[in-house]
């Protein structure tokens, strides 16, 4: 159940410190900066978010390499910190991608574009899960237990997922141009 207090926490004050006669801060809904943007700008934003995700994946890979080369004893707290930072980047990108999808599916009435964005999100989730599993399998604690065939299959899955992401991004760009 959503309480009045929880509901008030989901909005932002209209003017910081501004209160009505009742002493309750005035609130307005969060304003999404892309709400009235043309479709091509939404698509550009998706591409920007993909670039941010790519950078986060590079940071995750680098963090994992540093972890593996740090020991023994291994510097797990540093790696955990990197994973936490990267997770925040992925979560923020996912929230915004889902907001673009909702905008395209709802007010913009662009179900094809929305489906591309949904596919992109699902592929990125698959990629992240697979990369995380690969990193887990490559940890020193599991050295000697890894299955080289399974590792190869997971690496191929990452490659195929990345190819599918590229295709979806191309389809999104092409179909967005047709929609305008």
From Swiss-Prot:
Region (Disordered): 1-23
InterPro entries membership: REX1-B (IPR039491)
Transmembrane segments: none
Pfam families linked: DNA_repr_REX1B
Protein's name according to its UniProt entry: Required for excision 1-B domain-containing protein
Gene behind this protein: REX1BD
């Amino acid at each position: 159940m959503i309480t009045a207090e929880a509901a008030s926490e989901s909005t932002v004050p209209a003017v910081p410190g501004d209160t009505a006669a009742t002493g309750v801060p005035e609130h307005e809904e969060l304003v999404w900066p892309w709400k009235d943007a043309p479709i091509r700008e939404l698509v550009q934003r998706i591409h920007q978010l993909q670039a941010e995700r790519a950078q986060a994946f590079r940071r995750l890979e680098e963090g994992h390499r540093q972890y593996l080369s740090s020991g023994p004893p291994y510097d797990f707290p540093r790696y955990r910190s990197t994973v936490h930072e990267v997770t925040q980047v992925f979560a923020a990108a996912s929230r915004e991608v889902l907001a673009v999808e909702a905008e395209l599916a709802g007010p913009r009435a662009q179900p094809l574009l929305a489906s591309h964005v949904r596919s992109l999100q699902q592929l990125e989730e698959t990629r992240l899960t697979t990369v995380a599993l690969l990193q887990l399998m490559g940890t020193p604690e599991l050295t000697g237990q890894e299955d080289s065939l399974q590792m190869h299959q997971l690496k191929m899955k990452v490659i195929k997922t990345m190819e599918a992401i590229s295709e979806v991004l191309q389809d999104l760009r092409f179909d967005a141009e047709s929609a305008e």
